[in-house]
Design a protein with these regions (language model features):
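Gly/Pro/Ser/Thr-rich low-complexity, intrinsically disordered segments predominantly at protein N-termini
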Residues: 1-204
Length: 204
C-alpha cells in the first residue's frame, strides 16, 4: 500500500477507519466522522487561542492533582456508540480533536489518546465552523456518551452547557454570558468566571 502523504491521494467519498487514519502522513489536520473525512478549520485565530489558553489555565490548576485528567488539542479522541465495548482500530470510524476534554476513566487512555467518550468536552467556535459541523458534533457526542458538552461562542462571549439526561439525550442546562460564573455539572467545585475566559477578547 503506497504511503499517503497528500490529502489529494484520498477519496473524500470513501469510508475510512482509525487504522487508515494512523497511516496518513500529510500536513492537513482532519477528523474522521463515521468513516468520512472532515477537514478541520485552518489554524485557529488569536482570539480562539486566548480563550483556549484561559480555560486551560483554570482547568489545569483544578485537575492537576485529581484522578480525572485534562487534555487540550491536538489530542485524538476515538468515539463510537456507548453501548459498545472497546473496539479495535479497524472497527473505529470516528476520530475527533476537541479543543479541551476531561477524562476520568484511565482505562480508555492509551499512547494514541482516548479510546472512548471523555466525560467533559469543550469546543470553542471559530468562524470556520459550519452549522452542519456543529450539529454533527452535538449528535456524535450525545450518541457516544459524552456526559457534559460545552459550546463556547467567542463573538457573543457566551457558553452553552449541555448535560446528558437519564435517556442519554442532551439537555441545555445553562446559557451563560459575559461576567457570569459557570459551574460544570460534573465538577461543581470548579467555578469558571467568563469574565476571565473572555479577558482581552477583541472583536475582529
Amino acid at each position: 500500500m503506497p504511503k499517503i502523504t497528500q490529502l489529494s491521494q484520498l477519496d473524500l467519498n470513501e469510508t475510512y477507519s482509525y487504522a487508515d487514519y494512523l497511516t496518513w502522513q500529510f500536513n492537513e489536520t482532519v477528523e474522521l466522522i463515521k468513516g468520512k473525512i472532515m477537514l478541520m478549520s485552518p489554524a485557529p485565530n488569536i482570539e480562539h487561542q486566548r480563550i483556549a489558553r484561559n480555560l486551560y489555565g483554570m482547568c489545569y490548576i483544578f485537575f492537576r492533582h485529581k484522578k480525572c485528567q485534562f487534555f487540550p488539542a491536538p489530542f485524538d479522541v476515538r468515539l463510537y456508540d456507548r453501548k459498545k465495548s472497546l473496539l479495535a482500530n479497524t472497527d473505529i470510524h470516528t476520530v475527533v480533536q476537541p479543543d479541551l476534554c476531561v477524562i476520568c476513566n484511565p482505562d480508555i487512555l492509551d499512547k494514541q489518546g482516548c479510546n472512548g467518550a471523555p466525560d467533559w468536552i469543550i469546543e470553542i467556535l471559530s468562524k470556520g465552523n459550519s452549522k452542519r459541523e456543529m450539529q454533527i458534533k452535538y449528535q456524535l457526542y450525545q450518541e457516544s456518551g459524552v456526559q457534559e458538552y460545552w459550546l463556547v461562542y467567542p463573538e457573543q462571549q457566551a457558553v452553552h452547557q449541555f448535560v446528558l439526561d437519564d435517556k442519554g439525550c442532551y439537555q441545555l442546562k445553562c446559557m451563560a454570558a459575559e461576567d457570569d460564573i459557570v459551574t460544570p455539572y460534573l465538577f461543581p467545585e470548579l467555578a469558571i468566571d467568563l469574565a476571565e475566559v473572555f479577558e482581552n477578547w477583541v472583536e475582529e
